[in-house]
Amino acid sequence: MSRSNRQKEYKCGDLVFAKMKGYPHWPARIDEMPEAAVKSTANKYQVFFFGTHETAFLGPKDLFPYEESKEKFGKPNKRKGFSEGLWEIENNPTVKASGYQSSQKKSCAAEPEVEPEAHEGDGDKKGSAEGSSDEEGKLVIDEPAKEKNEKGTLKRRAGDVLEDSPKRPKESGDHEEEDKEIAALEGERPLPVEVEKNSTPSEPDSGQGPPAEEEEGEEEAAKEEAEAQGVRDHESL
């Protein structure tokens, strides 16, 4: 009982070995407790870990006096920062960490049991990431197949076009020859028509009309003269 009472009476600056889940008994120091954390962490001390410079809140049952437990818990350990912590607690027990490191590592060290859950969450995330990668892999596999099918159809269409293309020039060539022949015929036909059209209006201008009328007048005059002579001959008889 005297030992437990003595543990509960730790003061700021006392050197101890602190035990956390997943970690060996670590050289540490009782640090000052912030006033805001006193109510929420009743009967717990803010502990500063040498070597790693992390902080955590631990109860008296997890704290052991350094001098009494040095032979038991002060053996060398391969854990990172442990040997540095033993050196600091002996040679530089008043070392302090920066506020950023202490506040950041406090949350990490205060809840070590949560770390496995975090790892499980990471595992789930990794699983989901792997699942998504598998899905992406399927999508990637399907896309080349679609591209191959599309390329095949394009090749077939291109082949059909190439097969049709030699035929079309021939047909177009025949049509062109026919068009040329028709154009040549049409070009020949309008020429006489134009000549006729041009000749028709020229007839009145040439003066052929009036000479015909004069001939008719002369014939009539000749008939009249012949009749007159006949009358004269008859009278003379």
UniProtKB/Swiss-Prot annotation:
Q: Which organism is it from?
A: Mus musculus
Bias (Basic and acidic residues) ranges: 116-128, 135-173, 181-197, 223-237
Q: How is it modified after translation?
A: Sumoylated with SUMO1. Sumoylation prevents binding to chromatin. Phosphorylation at Ser-165 is likely to be required for secretion.
Q: Does the keyword DNA-binding apply?
A: yes
- Where are the Phosphoserine modifications? S128, S132, S133, S165, S199, S202, S206, S236
- Biased composition, Acidic residues: where in the chain? 212-222
- Tell me which family the UniProt entry assigns to this protein: Belongs to the HDGF family.
Outcome recorded upon mutating S202A: Does not affect secretion
> Which consequence is recorded for altering C12A?
Abolishes disulfide bond formation
Tissue expression, per UniProt?
A: Expressed predominantly in testis and skeletal muscle, to intermediate extents in heart, brain, lung, liver, and kidney, and to a minimal extent in spleen.
**What does the record list as GO biological process?**
cellular response to interleukin-7; negative regulation of neuron apoptotic process; positive regulation of cell division
Q: Please give the record's comment on domains.
A: The PWWP domain harbors the heparin-binding sites and is responsible for DNA-binding, while the C-terminal region is essentially unstructured.
Entry keywords, A to Z: Acetylation, Cytoplasm, Disulfide bond, DNA-binding, Growth factor, Heparin-binding, Isopeptide bond, Nucleotide-binding, Nucleus, Phosphoprotein, Repressor, Secreted, Transcription, Transcription regulation, Ubl conjugation
* Short sequence motif named Bipartite nuclear localization signal, residue ranges: 155-170
Compositional bias (Polar residues): 91-106
Taxonomically, the superkingdom here is Eukaryota
State whether keyword Transcription applies. yes
- Cross-linked residues for Glycyl lysine isopeptide (Lys-Gly) (interchain with G-Cter in SUMO) are K80
Residue(s) carrying Phosphothreonine: T200
PANTHER family to which the protein is assigned, alphabetical: HEPATOMA-DERIVED GROWTH FACTOR, HEPATOMA-DERIVED GROWTH FACTOR-RELATED
Q: Which residues carry this modification: N6-acetyllysine?
A: K44
PWWP domain boundaries: 12-69
Q: Where is this motif: Nuclear localization signal?
A: 75-80
Q: Where is this cross-link: Glycyl lysine isopeptide (Lys-Gly) (interchain with G-Cter in SUMO2)?
A: K80
Amino-acid positions noted as binding heparin in the UniProt annotation, renumbered to this chain: K19, K21, K72, K75, R79, K80
Q: What is this protein called?
A: Hepatoma-derived growth factor
